[in-house]
Amino acid sequence: MLIAYIDEVGEPGAFVSYDHAKFKTSPVFGYAGFVIPEERVHDFSRQVTQTKKDFFSFLHPADDYIPTWERKGAELVQKGAMERTKGRREILALRDLLEKVPAAGGSLFYFVREKAIGTPGQVWGSAPGSPETRSRIEERTLKCLAEAINRLCTHADNKNQNILLFQDMINESQRKAQVARSYANIYARMKEHQEMRRILEAPAYIDSELSSNIQCADWIA
């Protein structure tokens, strides 16, 4: 069996440009992470934990490591990181860790869709923060998650393996919507797409504070 860990790439809201006052976070949205054989999950988790300890020691050399401490990917891989001594050490440590994924029989996963450029009014004809805009953002998230699941199922089928999927914790209303949509997508596609039988359940959600592998998916995303 394969185990997949994924996290969101960017955010699903509107995007205008990187220098726009409000809509400047990300021109794409999707999911990224890694897939690894079940028998290598524990070993790789220990390697991720060690890398996280290394990150902590780079940034807080005089302090004791805190197991629930997180190093967010957005902070880790930021502009100019390689030009700073601590940032360079982190990037090189992350590179060394990710090289161990294929060595463990796993694969990196990355899927994004480019957003239509414009404010919510320009793209959807709705005001920022309005119910219509929130609904559009939720729909973008659900469609991208469904496509990520489709692609992970295809990968699992190519490997002749079943798969389980884990992602970072989100709020309860979002979780319920995503689980319901994921089940609907999986079962609706099964008749014509046999690879969908490879995924045994809809995604499960784990807090990245508690799961080293979910933390690693965040670094990749």
Predicted regions and their residues:
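Phosphate-ester processing/binding pockets and catalytic centers
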Residues: 1-221
